[in-house]
From Swiss-Prot:
Residues 9-27 have a biased composition (Basic and acidic residues). This is Putative endoplasmic reticulum metallopeptidase 1-B. Its cofactor is Zn(2+). It comes from Caenorhabditis elegans. Binds 2 Zn(2+) ions per subunit.
């Protein structure tokens, strides 16, 4: 370093730290009065600004239109009319695929409504209205996503279809709308997914009156087996004759009860399809963040979108209600709990989008529209922004390069102050991270997980309050060590360092082609201020500086708060069905917005009047500051926890219950010699959240409930009667089991028979293989667990052939029959991994026959348990439990 540069840095350091050489604090305060620093009034305005911003984004997030009546011209979607049939369908009760409620009551009511609409409009000129039904069978495999992957066979599942068009001849081009009318075994399906079916029936009424809108045919698919792993949609898109004309689809789903429906998947490719929604939707609510989060597998759920995309090779849109997810797949999912205005909003959006889509020239020749990945999001629910990802990359890189250039110039011209600001910026971030980590641990240790489950604002108290408080107070403390005349440069440098960090994050998103990086691009809008400062003087008036800073920070901070509100409202209910520690995820969501606010205000904090002297800004004061933040926050949480000791709440209008699952199981386990080693009746209690099974009141008080102890060493499912392969969602703390006295007596006990066993040798490597044929007899819903010994691998099944040899496999068989009894034949081939002699019985087969409906569904033990829960939860929050419970007949045998 040259002598001139050293001298310049020395002078810079002297000017910056001049405050330490002042003779007394009084002189310091006089200097502060002479320069343009922010006063308390400015900070009152800043606080009011962000308070209004938080309230405003929350209001916009929850805003819904008023339900409407039909208009005289029959051109207006009417929630009031749609909800009448919805209420009737919901009142049929639990309706899993194959049940009487599903196959007779619900299916026939939808058919009746379709026939009534057709009869009422039979004289409408130029209307073609076809109705069809389907009972379909097939097999396919589902890769790991919502579950851990499985092979599925189904038989006799039902579909109801209506096809509307203009003119006598069927159009060769059509658009598909899909809903499902079956339910989770213990749910009325008011929202998931009868609300979508009611919406589609209302659209059929409108198009029946206005066939001139039907430039192409529209197929309405009411499918009867989605909850059983997307079966009916697969049967339709692979076997029905109407499938060949479909050019696009709109899938309507629900993982919550009302609220604003979210477009969270679009494609694959076919940008014109996404544009139809973005250009036509009256109340758009979409985000590429939702699409990328869902496709990552973080969100626990799957929809028929996968089936139409993967097996039909058709592009589409996936729309779903995602708010109020507490009631999804529970007894509380009834029609009356759907937020008023939700169907009106969704119906208007789908109606306008479909009308736009039917006019699109790309529906006839979609290949002529160049496919490209896009960035899309709605800004606070007010309007939609969409642009190609290639343009996003270009803008991102230009912005990043600009920020880096500004930072490089600042580092060269103001080296010491840059190092000083960087040190303080890092200290502020580390302090926020330390406080968050401490609050996560202390809140979990002191008050338990999910305290914010019912009252979301408690998450803001637990994580938002200490983040903002710690960040601003620590930055103010560090600033107190500086000379007042140096704070302008110091504050500007802090702002530039913050922009550089955001640029680094945006660079990573750009490099990995993650479209969600738009959020960080918006946080770089304040770079305009740094550019202006570089080319000219930025006004020193504190009021002007405050207002302009807030205006430039508004797009990024508003979207950060809006996105956090959206993610919290979606993911907090999901935490009730996740066995992972939820505190880090929720603290991160809250801290993201809090951090965006605090760090964007770092420059203003540095340019504010500060009552501290340099002697009051040491390490000890920093420690006291952090401890004070933690102590006050924990005290506030303690006070709130004394009022609400349980995270759950029972309320007929808005219950937030603990999710549980119970299996009453007849369990018969055989050893290799074919002898029965276990013949027991067991009761499995499963908690789906992190608080675990010990949080269930009657489990906690009963010492006979114990943890899992696997009978077979190599059984990854540990004899737990999983309906689907979801063992990865649970850990040891989530499952408790005990023996019970009530032995289940089934009319048709589950049976597994080995039909044949043929040994062979692979001609390529000389290793042995065995081909088995089996027959399984059980209920309409059977889970099969295939578990070879450790020196064997599964190479083939009659359902599908695995891409690579598997250590174990999960098969799921479902069928619809009046007596709920089905027989399945399947083959399995296993291959030895060594050339040692073959074992006599190297294959373990487990069968769980699930009673999901009918008179044998629930034992007296289950009924008594549910009655006790319903009685106690009215007065005791800890008893606020919702239970999915049914009987299972299970057997394991070696072959």
């Amino acid at each position: 370093m040259s002598t001139g540069i050293r001298r310049r840095h020395a002078d810079e350091k002297k000017n910056i730290l001049e405050k330490e050489s002042l003779q007394n604090d009084e002189t310091q305060r006089e200097m502060e009065k002479d320069i343009s620093l922010l006063r308390p009034a400015h900070w009152n305005f800043i606080g009011l600004f962000f308070l209004v911003l938080i309230i405003g984004t929350t209001f916009l997030h929850k805003c819904l239109p008023e339900p409407k009546d039909p208009n005289q011209e029959e051109t207006q979607f009417s929630e009031k009319r749609a909800v009448k049939v919805l209420q009737e369908l919901s009142d049929y009760g639990w309706k899993p695929a194959g049940s009487y409620n599903c196959e007779e009551l619900t299916r026939n009511r939808i058919l009746k409504e379709l026939n009534d609409i057709r009869s009422q409009n039979q004289n409408v000129e130029n209307l073609r209205f076809d109705i069809d039904t389907q009972y379909v069978s097939g097999c396919f495999d589902i890769p790991a996503h919502d579950t851990e992957g499985m092979n599925i066979c189904y038989r006799n599942v039902s579909n109801v279809m209506a096809r509307l068009g203009k003119g006598e001849k069927k159009d060769k081009i059509s658009v598909l709308l899909n809903c499902h009318y079956d339910s989770w075994p213990t749910s009325n399906a008011g929202s998931d997914d009868l609300s979508s079916c009611a919406l589609m029936l209302e659209l059929i009424r409108l198009y029946s009156k206005n066939p001139h809108l039907l430039n192409h045919d529209v197929i309405f698919l009411f499918n009867g087996a989605e909850e059983s792993s997307l079966l009916a949609a697969h049967g339709f898109i692979t076997q029905h004759s109407w499938r060949h004309e479909i050019r696009a689809f709109i899938n309507l789903e629900a993982s919550g009860s009302g609220g604003r429906e979210l477009l969270f998947q679009a494609g694959p490719a076919n940008q014109w399809l996404l544009n139809s929604y973005l250009e036509a939707a009256i109340h758009p609510h979409c985000s590429v963040i939702g699409q990328e989060v869902f496709q990552s597998g973080v969100y626990p759920g799957d929809t028929d979108f996968r089936i139409f995309r993967d097996h039909g090779r058709v592009p589409g849109l996936d729309l779903a209600f995602v708010q109020n997810g507490y009631w999804w797949h529970t007894e509380f999912d009834t029609a009356e709990r759907i937020t008023k205005g939700s169907l009106q909003r969704a119906g208007e959006n789908v109606y306008s989008t479909l009308n736009h889509l039917l006019k699109s020239p790309y529906l006839e020749k979609p290949a002529e529209y160049a496919d490209r990945k896009t960035v899309f999001f709605d800004f606070l629910g007010l309007f939609v922004i969409i642009y190609p990802l290639s343009i996003a990359h270009l803008v991102n890189m230009l912005t990043i390069c600009t920020v880096i250039a500004l930072m490089s110039h600042r580092f060269y011209s103001k080296t010491f102050i840059t190092f000083l600001a960087l040190r303080d910026y890092v200290l502020t971030i580390l302090t926020i991270a330390l406080v968050l980590k401490a609050m996560t641990f202390m809140s979990l240790f002191t008050y338990g997980a999910l305290r914010w489950y019912t009252r979301h604002w408690l998450a803001l108290v637990a994580y938002g309050l200490p983040s903002v408080w710690a960040g601003i107070s620590v930055q103010g403390l560090l600033t107190a060590r500086l000379a007042p005349k140096a704070r302008e440069e110091y504050g500007s440098t802090l702002e530039l360092i913050h922009l550089t960090l955001i640029s680094g994050i945006l660079l990573a998103f750009t490099y990995y082609d993650i479209a969600s990086g738009f959020l960080f691009a918006l946080l770089l809008v304040p770079a305009i201020k740094s550019i202006i400062t570089y080319f000219g003087a930025w006004p020193t008036c504190p009021t002007f500086n405050t207002i302009l800073t807030l205006i430039l920070s508004f797009p990024g901070c508003a979207m950060a708060i809006y996105t956090t509100e959206m993610l919290l409202s979606i993911f907090i209910p999901i935490m009730g069905r996740s066995s992972y520690n939820p505190e880090p995820a929720v603290s991160f969501f809250v801290a993201f917005s809090a951090g965006c606010i605090v760090l964007s205000l770092g420059g203003l904090v540095a340019k504010s009047r500060n009552s501290r002297s340099s002697n009051e800004a040491g390490l000890l004061e920093l420690i006291y500051n952090i401890l004070g933040v933690l102590l006050v926050t924990l005290t506030i949480l303690y006070v709130f926890s004394s009022f609400w000791p349980s995270p759950y709440r029972f309320d007929n209008v808005y219950p937030t219950a603990k999710r549980t699952q119970f299996f009453h199981v007849n369990q018969m386990l055989y050893d290799r010699n074919g002898q029965i080693s276990v013949n027991d009746t067991r009761f499995y209690a499963i908690s789906h959240d992190y608080r675990g099974a010990e949080d269930i009141p009657f489990v906690k008080k009963d010492p006979e409930y114990t943890g899992l102890q696997c009978h077979y060493e190599n059984n990854p499912w540990c004899e737990t009667p999983f309906l689907f392969p979801t063992k990865g969602r649970l850990n040891e703390r989530n499952i408790r089991v005990r023996s019970v006295d009530e032995r289940l007596k089934f009319k048709h006990p589950v049976k597994i028979l080995g039909i044949s066993k043929r040994h062979g040798v692979d001609s390529k490597d000389g290793k042995g293989n065995i081909e088995y044929s089996f027959s399984v007899i059980g209920t309409g819903q059977i889970s099969v667990y295939i578990i070879p010994d450790t020196t064997w691998l599964i190479t083939n099944t009659s359902v599908t052939q695995p891409k690579t040899p598997q250590e174990n496999m999960f098969l799921y068989y479902t069928c619809s029959t009046p007596n709920n009894i089905c027989e399945w034949m399947f083959k399995v081939t296993i291959k030895k991994t060594t050339q040692t002699p073959s074992d006599d019985k190297p294959l373990l087969i487990g069968i769980s026959s699930h009673y999901l409906h009918g008179p044998e569904m629930q034992s007296e033990s289950i009924k008594n348990m549910i009655a006790k829960i319903q009685e106690n939860r009215v007065n005791s929050p800890e008893w606020t439990v919702t239970a999915s419970a049914w009987n299972v007949d299970q057997v394991y045998k070696y072959f």
